[in-house]
Structure formats: structure tokens, C-alpha cells
Amino acid sequence: MNVDHKGHTITIKDTQGDFSSFLDKVSQSNASFESHNLIIDLSHNKSVTNTDLKLLLPLSKQHKKAKKSFVVVAEGIDFNAVPAQLVVVPSVLEAHDIIEMEEIERDLGF
């Protein structure tokens, strides 16, 4: 697990390719991340499925409740089958763009 902190955003990258252990690590250390916008980068793990992504919903809901963004980066999945409550994009650049847009929406009171 690689953690990169830039400004108001933390990017957590799965470096081992084992989604279950990665999810456990992120869940255990979520308390230290919940005051920041979070990007979960699973782009290097080609075995991630939509079922795996659904396991991230509780973390996403916690961040949304705290008025912070939670974006998942994943490739090779069916984006139409992803739950609407979860923001999933194909690249880290798009994840940063989503966070910037959500920050603007929050600043405007939406």
C-alpha cells in the first residue's frame, strides 16, 4: 500500500494486487484519512471486479457524510454496473478532476 498526500487529497495505491488485504489495511487506517479527500487507486490490480468495488461502499458513505470526496480508480470493469453511490473513474487525473468539482459544489453549498 502506497500513500501519497497532496494538499487536501490522499491517494492510496494498491501495490500488492491483493484486494482483500488492501481493503483491510485501508479500513483499519481509515480514521487517519477521514478528514481528507480520498482516492483509492486500484488501476494496477487487473483482477478487481464490480463485486470487490461494492465492498468499498461503507468507506465511501463515511467520507460523503464527513463532506469529503471518495473516488476509486479502476480499469477493466463495467462502469455501468457500479453502484451510483460509488464514484469510479478510469484514471487518477479524472479522480482529481472529480474531487475538484465536488469541492467547488461544497463551497457553493450544493
Sequence positions of predicted segments:
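Flexible, charged surface loops at secondary-structure boundaries
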Residues: 4-6, 31-34, 63-65
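Alpha-helical scaffolding segments of alpha/beta enzyme cores, especially the outer helices
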Residues: 54-58
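Hydrophobic beta-strand segments of well-ordered beta-sheets in folded domains
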Residues: 8-9, 35-40, 67-71
